[in-house]
Amino acid sequence: MREQRATAPRTKPALLTRLNRMTGDGTPVVTYSIIAVSVFVYLLQLIPALGVTEALLYAGAYSYPQFFEPWRMLTSVFVHSTGGFPFHILLNMYTLWIFGSLLERMLGRWRFLVVYLLSGLAGSLGVLFLAAPNVAVVGASGAIFGVISAFLVIHQRLGANMTQLVVLVAINLVIGFIPGFGISWQAHLGGLIGGALLGLIFVQTRKRSQQTLQIALLIALAAVMILLSFSKFLV
């Protein structure tokens, strides 16, 4: 019996096998995971008693010493407007599915995650510095603008013609300035700038011999963003 057990082939659960295939064939796992988490959080938001939206949204006031809750600068990226038809989350997740999948395959999973999170943080910094402290924001738009911006910068620097995408981004940015749409242009602009900086870092340090420099620049950029998030302590 012992000999039979030792020689018998070991089988993996179907779920583990599928996950191994996904992580090995270029499937944009991080993009899909972000979409899944965002949808799950949205469903929780629909239960008023949980108070998810109020607990995770961001406003500039939460970066002031009196109300300091810095985690909201990132958690707000995963919550969306729940009023009426779920247009907000559907549009954001559809856009993320398109550009996130492309950028993740290009950069790899961990680099893409860095782009998404730091772009989201940059979007919140835009709200902190450009919006009134009591203006609350939710949504992944800042992070997604960063993803698109990084995608655009990388392709532009590599010689691709990105004119149509530049026009599309410009139109969406301008729409944010139109009163009545309820769009946070501040988050869009912040994410756009953050994503562009990240794109420049990746495209300028794409050689294998520059990996240490790339990591150092990413850490430096993240450190600057974190320091900026504490800026209201100096006021």
Residue ranges and their predicted role:
Residues 125-129, 159, 196, 200:
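Membrane-embedded alpha-helical segments of multi-pass transporters/permeases
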Residues 118, 164-173, 214-222:
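Central hydrophobic cores of alpha-helical transmembrane segments
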Residues 104-107, 155-160, 204-212:
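Membrane-interface helix-boundary motifs at transmembrane edges
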Residues 34, 38-45, 97-98, 150-151, ...:
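Alpha-helical transmembrane segments of multi-pass membrane proteins
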Residues 1-23, 176-235:
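C-terminal transmembrane module of polytopic alpha-helical membrane proteins
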Residues 100, 150-154, 195-203:
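Hydrophobic transmembrane alpha-helices
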Residues 90, 140-148, 189-193:
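Membrane-embedded alpha-helical segments of multi-pass membrane proteins
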Residues 26-140, 178-186:
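N-terminal TM1-TM2 helical hairpin plus the immediately adjacent luminal interfacial "cap"
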